[in-house]
Amino acid sequence: MQKTKEKVLKVGMHDEDKFDREKRIPWIKFNLIQKSRVLVVGAGALGNEVGKNLVLSGFKKISIVDMDKIVKSNLSRCALFKVEDVEKGYLKAEVLARELKKIDPSVEVSWYSKAIQELPEDFLKQFDIVFGCLDNIMARLYINSHAYYYGIPLVDGGTLGTSGKVQVVIPPKTACIECGMNKTHFKNLEQIFSCSGREDVTIYSPKLPAEITTTAVIAALQVLTGIKIISKQYDALPQNLIYYDGYRNVFEVLEVPINKNCPNHIMEKSTKGKKKQPE
């Protein structure tokens, strides 16, 4: 008589896989998440939360770009930075990379303590998705332009006090960040310089209000959106800006139309060097 093989279920066996609960969400393509190459630009408050969420969501290949050192005012909004990091003058990108490795030692984390504009022109080309976690409009426009040119999805986040926004840019299907800017924006365009004490800084922008709960909400929306993109759930993406007002308890989804005169869309006609677009 042939013996039948029975699958033995051990009590608690599903608790041995730390990603078991996430894998139970049917639309999440966990294998794609683990293969994806992710770039986080900005390692401050949003970068801390986004980085932590990425690692806990199963992303294994993460690169971080930030030119600044950690300062004391970061500590109320950056869960992964400590007082000793300030005292020793550590770099944001370096410390964030170090702390993400502590959360999951199997994660491959690289870091660059430079302005994104100082990296090679085709630096973004190697990534599958970019997360913008910046307070610098010039850097934001830089990653917007380069990500759009190479056909790489960009999930950009920003906060102001208890309000925040997430903009989703899927080339060439959606508007880009620059599409939503008007003449006033460009007239008032001013770079927010590093707080690291660089000698070449002569103009400073005022410090903006910020607090951790808003940062946490925006970062969560960014990473959830990124999971949808990597899992190819394009129909579930917002079209294409989420606005959050924590004081008024309001979420709004706004559609930003493509500006045909936007230089990124004019340049789109030339597809040389671009990556394959999402289907």
Task: Report residues per predicted region.
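Hydrophobic Val/Ile/Leu positions in short beta-strands of Rossmann-like dinucleotide-binding domains
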Residues: V40-A43, I64
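Conserved S-adenosyl-L-methionine
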Residues: L56-K61
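Generic hydrophobic/aromatic pocket-lining and core-packing "Φ" positions
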Residues: G51-K52, N144
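E1/E1-like adenylate-forming module used to activate ubiquitin-like modifiers
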Residues: V109-W111, E121-I218, K228-Y234, D245-P278
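Conserved acidic residues
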Residues: S113-A115
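N-terminal charged helix/coil linker that caps or initiates catalytic domains
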Residues: M1-L39, K72, M267, K274-E279
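Glycine-rich phosphate-binding loop and adjoining beta1-alpha1-beta2 segment
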Residues: I64-D104
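Hydrophobic/small residue at the entry helix of a nucleotide-binding pocket
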Residues: L46
